[in-house]
């Protein structure tokens, strides 16, 4: 029996030596065939003793993995094909880090802006103080102490300067009108040429009578007729008054001057139309 099993064992050893450089995928079917051969060797002992024959040669089946080594794929995302895909992959990988850094940067910017705005408000309040202090919001006349509505509190103190400017302008206008009224001459009724002439003639006659009476008195007292300056000044003043009253028209003025010259003729020598400025008593 031992001599009958020896050829089969040699064949198996040769097959095993030939299958050593094969891959792990071929080792599994080789082990299975080896076990089958060993199990079936006992059955074939009787037949091999009578007629020893070699079994047909075994040809292992080729698997697709025996053709050559394949590239091993590494774990992880595939490399990006363009720039945008790279940015998207970067944000996906570091989304938490980006969120934390962004929130901190936003908080820092908010604090800086709030500090700058507060500083500007303080500077503005220093240069332009509030026109309404806090004490003005309390009604001192309210003895009951009732709270006032916010709408009742005035936003700003009433400005009285426009009223003062208006009063001053009105006062100036009133002063100008009063000054112009004072400068105007009093209204007088226009006198006719006949009335003015009559008034001048009456005044001239009265002055002549006074002058003659004074001359008679002086002649009686001293025996020398002396013309006093008063007697000569009075006709001059009367003539001037008559000329002013009748001076509204040029014709009336000329008539009054002629009448005055005629009235002054017998009283004194006609040295000048008016003897008010220079009067020399004649002895």
Curated annotation (Swiss-Prot):
InterPro entries: TMEM119 (IPR031453)
Keywords per UniProt: Biomineralization, Cell membrane, Cytoplasm, Differentiation, Endoplasmic reticulum, Glycoprotein, Membrane, Osteogenesis, Phosphoprotein, Proteoglycan, Secreted, Signal, Spermatogenesis, Transmembrane, Transmembrane helix
Tissue: Expressed in brain microglia (at protein level). Detected in urine (at protein level). Elevated expression levels seen in the brain of patients with Alzheimer disease. Expressed by osteoblast-like cells in bone tissues and follicular dendritic cells in lymphoid tissues.
Transmembrane domains' residue ranges: 97-117
Primary location class: membrane
Topological domains, Cytoplasmic: 118-283
Protein's cellular compartments: Cell membrane; Cytoplasm; Endoplasmic reticulum membrane; Secreted
Single GO biological process annotation from the record: negative regulation of myotube differentiation
Top-level taxon: Eukaryota
A single cellular component GO annotation: plasma membrane
Basic and acidic residues composition-biased segments: 153-164, 198-213
Residues bearing attached sugar chains per UniProt: 41
Modified positions (Phosphoserine) in chain numbering: 272
Membrane protein topology class: Single-pass type I membrane protein
Topological domains, Extracellular: 26-96
Signal peptide extent: 1-25
Low complexity bias (residue ranges): 43-52, 238-264
Start and end residues of each stretch annotated as Disordered: 43-76, 136-168, 183-283
The protein's assembly and partners: Interacts with SMAD1, SMAD5 and RUNX2.
Function description: Plays an important role in bone formation and normal bone mineralization. Promotes the differentiation of myoblasts into osteoblasts. May induce the commitment and differentiation of myoblasts into osteoblasts through an enhancement of BMP2 production and interaction with the BMP-RUNX2 pathway. Up-regulates the expression of ATF4, a transcription factor which plays a central role in osteoblast differentiation. Essential for normal spermatogenesis and late testicular differentiation.
PANTHER family: TRANSMEMBRANE PROTEIN 119
Protein's recorded name: Transmembrane protein 119
Organism annotation: Homo sapiens (Human)
Gene name of the record: TMEM119
């Amino acid at each position: 029996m031992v001599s009958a099993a020896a050829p089969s064992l040699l064949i198996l050893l040769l097959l095993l030596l030939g299958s050593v450089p094969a891959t792990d995928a071929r080792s599994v079917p080789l082990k299975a065939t080896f076990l089958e051969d060993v199990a079936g060797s006992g059955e074939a002992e009787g037949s091999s003793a009578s007629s020893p024959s070699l079994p047909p040669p075994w040809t292992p089946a080729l698997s697709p993995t025996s053709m050559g080594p394949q590239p091993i794929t590494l774990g992880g995302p595939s490399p990006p094909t363009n720039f945008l895909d790279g940015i998207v992959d970067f944000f996906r990988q570091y989304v938490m880090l980006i969120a934390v850094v962004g929130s901190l940067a936003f908080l820092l910017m908010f604090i800086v802006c709030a500090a700058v705005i507060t500083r500007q408000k303080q500077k503005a309040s220093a240069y332009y103080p509030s026109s309404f202090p806090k004490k003005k919001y309390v009604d001192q006349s309210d003895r009951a102490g009732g709270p006032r509505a916010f709408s009742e509190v005035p936003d700003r103190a009433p400005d009285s300067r426009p009223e003062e400017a208006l009063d001053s302008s009105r006062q100036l206008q009133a002063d100008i009108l009063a000054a112009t009224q004072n400068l105007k001459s009093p209204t007088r009724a226009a006198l006719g040429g006949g009335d003015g002439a009559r008034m001048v003639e009456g005044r001239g006659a009265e002055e002549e009578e006074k002058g003659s009476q004074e001359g008679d008195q002086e002649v009686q007292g001293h025996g020398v007729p002396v013309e006093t300056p008063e007697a000569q000044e009075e006709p001059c003043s009367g003539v001037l008054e008559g000329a002013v009253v009748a001076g509204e028209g040029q014709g009336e003025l000329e008539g009054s001057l002629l009448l005055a010259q005629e009235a002054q003729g017998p009283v004194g020598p006609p040295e000048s139309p008016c003897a008010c400025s220079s009067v020399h008593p004649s002895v």
